[in-house]
């Protein structure tokens, strides 16, 4: 284990995992750097780690630490000057009738079934489409930081919440929101993911938070490069956040 001198965050230690198959770029091996012990990573420390390029998966806080590859670039949307483009405005208008309900992390069978439908449609054969309830819970519903579960439902005929369409897990940081994971009904062309990012930007603006952290942008990965369409954004390159010029 090694300590990072540039992270004055209590007594954290950091270790590198063994190589494992990369989830985003075929035929590549990935490694992660994991922050420990997890019980010291409360919200203030976690906010500092996210600002330095870390992410959270359940109780694990990590960042890419790959040999000879730096394709994963942390990206955050700058909230105050953000303006949606034409396609994003269409997605916002299309789903304007969705009702959002913010909850503490909790297990509901309806959420889990939606998660499985999403994984089977979007990531079939990747392993997560076979996640058990325990695996789902460990991945999304365990946290020591300020986390929320947001469910999005259609408006029912009587004005009450209707059919579940999307669930999003997010963390509330000192300087923004961090999009942990989102899954939704796999309807072709529905643009639920775009709508969700726009919703988080709106929430951050309401809360007076300057950033929405979208995780890692990977230019070569179609699953990840959509994030660059949210402008303006900043990329963390060589240890510094830099405003995108495009």
From Swiss-Prot:
One GO location term (cellular component): cytoplasm
Keywords (A to Z) from UniProt: Acyltransferase, Cytoplasm, Transferase
Disulfide bonds: none
Subcellular location: Cytoplasm
UniProt-listed Enzyme Commission number(s): 2.3.2.29
Family annotation (InterPro entries): Acyl_CoA_acyltransferase (IPR016181), Asp_Glu_LeuTrfase (IPR017138), N-end_Aminoacyl_Trfase (IPR030700), N-end_Aminoacyl_Trfase_C (IPR007472), N-end_Aminoacyl_Trfase_N (IPR007471)
GO molecular function, one term: arginyl-tRNA--protein transferase activity
Biological processes annotated in GO: ubiquitin-dependent protein catabolic process via the N-end rule pathway
Catalysed conversion reaction: N-terminal L-glutamyl-[protein] + L-leucyl-tRNA(Leu) = N-terminal L-leucyl-L-glutamyl-[protein] + tRNA(Leu) + H(+); N-terminal L-aspartyl-[protein] + L-leucyl-tRNA(Leu) = N-terminal L-leucyl-L-aspartyl-[protein] + tRNA(Leu) + H(+)
Pfam families: ATE_C (PF04377), ATE_N (PF04376)
UniProt cross-references to HAMAP family, sorted A to Z: Bpt
Family per similarity comment: Belongs to the R-transferase family. Bpt subfamily.
Summary of the function given for this chain in its UniProt record: Functions in the N-end rule pathway of protein degradation where it conjugates Leu from its aminoacyl-tRNA to the N-termini of proteins containing an N-terminal aspartate or glutamate.
Name recorded for this polypeptide: Aspartate/glutamate leucyltransferase
Organism from which the protein derives: Acidovorax ebreus (strain TPSY) (Diaphorobacter sp. (strain TPSY))
